[in-house]
A protein has these predicted regions:
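Active-site beta->alpha loop and helix N-cap motifs at the rims of alpha/beta catalytic domains
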Residues: 8-154, 158-159, 166-168
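Short boundary motifs at domain starts and secondary-structure transition points
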Residues: 2-7
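Catalytic alpha/beta core domains of metabolic enzymes, predominantly
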Residues: 109-279
């Protein structure tokens, strides 16, 4: 199996793993394997501090043949905030790369934490309107992100560049944002906007159709949060989105918008996407 995170020819079903110990993480990964997941989404920050080492992460990576994405959203298992510098947050991602993880999630506000909760740059792009979160336009910060991406590439692994603006955005805005992020040379781009109305839902579907036509080098994953967002997690992969994040149905710390793995697999089977020959 090709363990590159961007290698699949069909949308990935990524099992979300948020656990405190390697043993619990490996058990959850086995559950996802048995129920049809095609990738793993590993929240590194949820581990107890003693397990945030190359050795412990390597145990988890080596436990499966599925491609794995490492994340550090600076939140503990109970989703409370972790106080750490941007360099410390990036260092945990690099530890996972050293441990052999296939790719890491570089948040769009990386190296500029003020951009996490509001837009602080110059409002000169279509996608900087209405106070989007996690969007950086400062060239010095962008250069730091490029350096991180180049470092990961130099270690033979991939980078998913993600941003969660948390506002409704038009297709034009998202298309411009994707092209803007692509200039940093990630391997996958993930954008999560907000979708609360039927009109916004239809716009999200049309946006994904447009993004597919960009024919960029990068794989693109686009879905929404909000009242209507769950539908985009199911339908957007049909329109070209690269990933669907899935959980175990009884997980206490799952996001309400995320689909359970059994539901997602049964849906994806209708398109022949779970057949091994399509991978």
């Amino acid at each position: 199996m090709d363990k590159r995170f961007s290698a699949s020819n069909t949308p990935l079903l990524a099992g979300v793993v948020k656990e405190r110990t390697p043993e619990a993480a490996i058990e959850k990964i086995r559950y996802f394997e048995e129920n049809g997941a095609t990738a793993i989404d590993l929240h590194l920050s949820c581990f107890d501090d003693e397990y945030k080492t190359v050795e412990h992460i390597k145990r988890i990576v080596d436990s499966t043949d599925l491609p794995m994405l490492g994340l550090n959203y600076s939140r503990r298992y109970d989703w409370t905030e972790i106080e750490e510098t941007e360099e410390e947050r990036a260092d945990l991602l690099l530890k996972s790369v050293e441990a052999g993880i296939a790719a890491v999630d570089l948040l769009g506000y990386s190296f500029d934490p003020n951009s996490r909760g509001k837009f602080v740059g110059e409002d000169k792009y279509s996608f900087t309107k209405n106070n989007p979160l996690e969007i950086v336009t400062d060239e010095a910060v962008i250069e730091k992100q490029k350096e991180f991406i180049n470092r990961v590439h130099g270690m033979g692994k991939e980078v998913l560049l993600s941003t969660h603006p948390d506002i409704p955005m038009s297709g034009n805005q998202i298309e411009d944002l994707v092209c803007f992020l692509a200039e940093r040379d990630p391997d996958i781009i993930k954008i999560v906007t907000r979708c609360n109305t039927e009109d916004e839902l239809v716009e999200a579907f049309d946006t994904m159709r447009r993004l597919k036509k960009l024919n960029l080098r990068q794989k693109i994953s686009f879905h929404c949060c909000g009242e209507m967002g769950r539908t985009t997690r199911l339908i957007n992969p049909v329109l070209g989105s690269y990933m669907c994040f899935c959980t175990k149905a009884d997980d206490g710390n799952r996001l309400k918008e995320q689909l359970d793995i059994v539901t997602a697999v049964n849906f994806f089977k209708q398109f022949g996407w779970m057949d091994s020959e399509t991978k």
